[in-house]
Design a protein with these regions (language model features):
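Extended, charge-rich alpha-helical interface modules
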Residues: 1-80
Length: 80
């Protein structure tokens, strides 16, 4: 997956997160929507982490394609 692909996925996920948050402001989300929001947030964390890995590998002369998405439990606990 190229950086542009990761960024495209990030943009799609961010748009969906925005839709869900807007809906949340207007009404209560269904259980399914709350689950989807949690999934979107997690997938965004994974994508941002993957993009950071790719950029770091490139900066230090390593193959960015060797970067792999980390486990959800790993990226969930990162401090921003």
């Amino acid at each position: 997956m190229e950086d542009q692909d990761v960024l495209g996925t990030i943009n799609q996920l961010a748009a969906r997160e925005e839709e869900l948050r807007a809906a949340e402001g207007e009404r209560h989300l269904t259980a399914e929507e709350r689950g989807e929001l949690a999934d979107v947030e997690l997938r965004l964390d994974q994508c941002w982490d993957l993009l950071r890995q790719r950029r770091a590998r490139r900066e230090f002369g390593q193959d960015p394609d060797a970067a792999e998405p980390r486990a959800p439990g790993t990226v969930e606990n990162y401090r921003q």
